[in-house]
Amino acid sequence: MLYLKEMNLEDAKVQWDFFQTWNDENGVQNHYFKMNYDEFCNSAIPKRIEFSKGINLPEGYVPDTYYFLYDSEVGENQIVGLFMIRHFLNDFLFNGSGHIGYIIHPEFRGRGYGTKGLKLAIEKLKEMSDFVEDEIFLRCLRSNEASLKVMLNNGGYLHHQD
């Protein structure tokens, strides 16, 4: 069974392990790659939890929540992807990365997790009380055909190409 779970301290080890499997890829930045585990637990996770609640946001940022995609059929604590949901957009995000960024664990790519996880992430976004836009905006690099396919599989359309 696939499910999304917010970043939290209880699952810190498997979350940290996930971040060590990939570095910046296809426009998704990994600020936690090679971060030591103690710093991840004591600083990174509490800060992400605050950001998800709109607390102590740097200027120009909007609340965003990190959701890990788990597949219980692969393993009880197996993270197969990460979906970063921005609760609403400012001008920068509207013209930039959009509402949802995501990455699938390198070991689990090509298995449909992107499509299924994005569907769950879209449902989460629509449930958020501060989501006010009429449409959900997503963006991917032109060279990232797999991500474009994931978006199209979830009812997306190509608005424009840069």
Where do the protein language model's features map onto the residues?
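GNAT-family acyltransferases
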Residues: 1-99
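Short aromatic/hydrophobic contact patches that present stacked aromatics
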Residues: 3, 101, 137-139
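Amphipathic alpha-helical recognition patches that constitute DNA-binding helices
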Residues: 14, 99, 135-137, 146
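A short, internal acetyl-CoA/4′-phosphopantetheine-binding micro-motif in the GNAT/acyltransferase core
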Residues: 70, 87, 99-110, 141
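Conserved acetyl-CoA-binding loop-helix of GNAT-fold acetyltransferases
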Residues: 101-104, 110-125, 148-153
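Helix N-cap/coil-helix junction residues
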Residues: 113, 130-131, 156
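Conserved GNAT acetyl-CoA-binding A-motif
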Residues: 127-140
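Conserved active-site alpha-helix within GNAT-family acetyltransferase domains
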Residues: 142-160
